């Protein structure tokens, strides 16, 4: 075959290839313009979801008894309805509205139940879709609105610093337990942050090899966590967190209520916390004796270590009641993790206080 024939064949093949490529491109462009991507709409039948939820837990002859309600909602029904009522009154998001077609939207019960289920079980956002009939993005929005407004409505009451009356009650409890002047136990816990941004992992990763966020808390015997400092990187130890913590701000700025108590005939005017051995030897921290010598020292070490476990018990209850704290944090936003943690603390003490009030009335 001559060179001229070969050149003609190559040119012809190139023309055919160019034509095929141009036709393929035009077909793709035309199909894209003719078939725009639309948002997938799923008819979830919201009314059926509300009716099922109402019949299961809230009607007069509900399917599930009160003990199962408390186990699944982590609180009794009266308290849950109180929260739903407050949110419905003060937050427009939790009020039931109608969509553009006039159909009723999600009820306050559905929205609050979705948020509580995520907090209680630490499950994925779409895990409640089949039962409550709301989508993943709506469930996450319910969770964030719930945590944000629980803190706004109840935080000042249940996450506040102790008033003079509260402080006197804590001092009385401490004296009964053999520690006059004690107002609580202080310690830290680490919450794994699964979706920590890659650029931050070095700052938040400690010896376990996983990034964590630190919660510093002061807890009393009745599990009241009246001081919570959350958000420090996991590489910090308890002393580093204490350096950043506002736990002593009221004392330094002269806003703390005055305290007076007597031990062995000596009067003191500064309350203290029970701690483990890592904390500095300040007058506001009382630690155990690592190597007690003699019966008195052994008795003191035994009582101090037992009483100090109040804060560890509070951490255990926190993780047992709300698995979202026990499981790794899935959000990319540390602020939202902070709101989830703070809301959980508020909800736990709110439920505990209501239960204690109910026991007193009985």
Task: Indicate residue ranges for each PLM-predicted region.
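Short, polybasic Lys/Arg-rich linear motifs in disordered N-terminal/cytosolic regions
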Residues: 1-362
């Amino acid at each position: 075959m001559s060179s001229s024939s070969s050149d003609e064949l190559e040119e012809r093949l190139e023309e055919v290839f160019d034509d095929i490529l141009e036709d393929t491109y035009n077909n793709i462009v035309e199909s894209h313009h003719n078939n725009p991507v639309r948002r997938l709409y799923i008819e979830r039948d919201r009314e059926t979801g509300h009716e099922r939820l109402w019949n299961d837990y809230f009607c007069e002859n509900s399917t599930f008894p009160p003990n199962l309600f408390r186990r699944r909602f982590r609180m009794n029904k009266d308290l849950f309805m109180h929260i739903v009522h407050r949110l419905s009154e003060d937050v427009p998001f939790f009020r039931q509205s109608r969509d553009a077609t006039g159909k009723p939207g999600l009820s306050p019960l559905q929205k609050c139940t979705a948020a509580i289920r995520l907090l209680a079980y630490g499950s994925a956002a779409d895990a409640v879709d089949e039962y409550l009939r709301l989508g993943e993005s709506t469930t996450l929005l319910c969770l964030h609105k719930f945590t944000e407004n629980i803190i706004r409505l109840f935080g000042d009451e249940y996450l506040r610093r102790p008033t003079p009356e509260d402080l006197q009650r804590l001092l009385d409890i401490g004296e009964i337990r053999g520690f006059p002047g004690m107002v609580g136990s202080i310690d830290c816990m680490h919450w794994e942050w699964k979706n920590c941004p890659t650029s931050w992992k070095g700052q938040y990763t400690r010896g376990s090899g996983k990034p964590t966020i630190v919660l510093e808390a002061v807890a009393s015997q009745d599990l009241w966590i009246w001081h919570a400092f959350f958000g420090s990187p996991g590489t910090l130890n308890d002393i580093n967190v204490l350096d950043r913590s506002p736990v002593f701000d009221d004392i330094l700025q002269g806003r703390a209520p005055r305290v007076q108590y007597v031990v062995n005939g000596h009067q003191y005017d500064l309350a203290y916390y029970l701690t483990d051995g890592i904390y500095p030897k300040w007058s506001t921290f009382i630690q155990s004796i690592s190597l007690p010598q003699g019966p008195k020292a052994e008795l003191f070490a035994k009582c101090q270590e037992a009483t100090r476990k109040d804060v560890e018990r509070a951490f255990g209850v926190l993780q047992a009641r709300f698995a979202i704290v026990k499981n790794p944090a899935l959000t990319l936003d540390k602020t939202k993790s902070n709101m989830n943690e703070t809301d959980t603390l508020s909800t736990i003490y709110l439920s505990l206080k209501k239960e204690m009030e109910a026991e007193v009335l009985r």
